[in-house]
Amino acid sequence: MELKHKTALVTGACGGIGRAVVMALVAQGARVIAFDRDIEAVTALAEGFGGACDPIAVDLGDAAALQAVMKDIAGRFEVIDILVNNAGVLSPHKLAATTLEEWHRLMAVNLDAALLLTQAVVPAMKENRWGRLINISSYAWKSGGLTAGTAYSVSKSAMVGLTYSSARELAPFGVTANAVAPAYVVSPMIMEQLSEEDRQRQLAAIPVGRFCQPEEVAHAVRFLASPLSGFMTGTVVDMNGGLQFG
C-alpha cells in the first residue's frame, strides 16, 4: 500500500483510462477524488470503492465551475498529493475541417483544465514538499496528427509543454511532473471513432500487433505516483507499441 495516506485527484474518471487509474490508485491505498461530467456514472464508480473514492461531477470546459469546485475541495482536503490530468476530448478533424468552436472546446477541456487544476494543487504540494503531477498526453503529441485530428494533437503537445515547465519549476520543492503518451488505447473514446477497416489498418502498423489496454496506462501512472518515481521528472512515458518505428 505504497500510497496509503495520499490523496489523488483523477479527471475523466469514468473513461477507460480514468477508471483503470482510479482502481490502480485505490488498490495502492490512496483516497481518490474522481472527476467526471456524468454524475450518475461517477457516483456509481465511487460506490464500488466504498469510502476510498469521492465522486464529483463537473464540466472541465467550464472554468468558473471548475474553480468553484476546487475551492470547495480545498476546504475538505488539506492537500492533493497526486493530480492525474486524464480527461480529454478527441476529434479526428484535420486542419481544414477544424472549426474555431471545436478548437476552443478541446483546448478548454484538454489543456486549460489541466492548467487550472495544477495551479490549484501545487501550493499545498510545495508546502508539503511532496507531490506528483501526471498528465495523460498521447502519441499524437509528436506524430503530426497520425492518430488524431489537429486540435487534439496540438492540445496533447501543449500538455507535454506544461509537463516540462512544471517539472523544471517544481523540482526543488519535491514535486515531480511527468506525462504518459499512449497510442490507440482500447476505450470507447478511441475505438468508437475507428471503423473496422481503420482498426485493422492501425493494427498492421503497430509492431506489437495489438492496441494498448487501459490497465497498462494505469500501471505507468501508479508508478509515477509512487515514492519510487521520485528521481523522474520532466519525462514522457511513451506507450505506443513500437508505432514510432512504422
What are these regions (language model features)?
Residues 123, 168-169, 230:
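Alpha-helical segment proximal to the catalytic Tyr-Lys
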Residues 2-4, 143, 222, 233-246:
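Short C-terminal tail/terminal secondary-structure segment
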Residues 14-15:
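Conserved glycine-rich cofactor-binding loop
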Residues 206-217, 228:
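A conserved structural motif in NAD(P)-dependent oxidoreductases
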Residues 118, 155, 163:
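Active-site helix of classical SDR
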Residues 94-95, 102-104, 190, 202:
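Substrate-binding pocket helix/loop in short-chain dehydrogenase/reductase
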Residues 171-176, 232-234:
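Short, small/polar-rich loop/turn modules that mediate ligand/substrate recognition or access, typified
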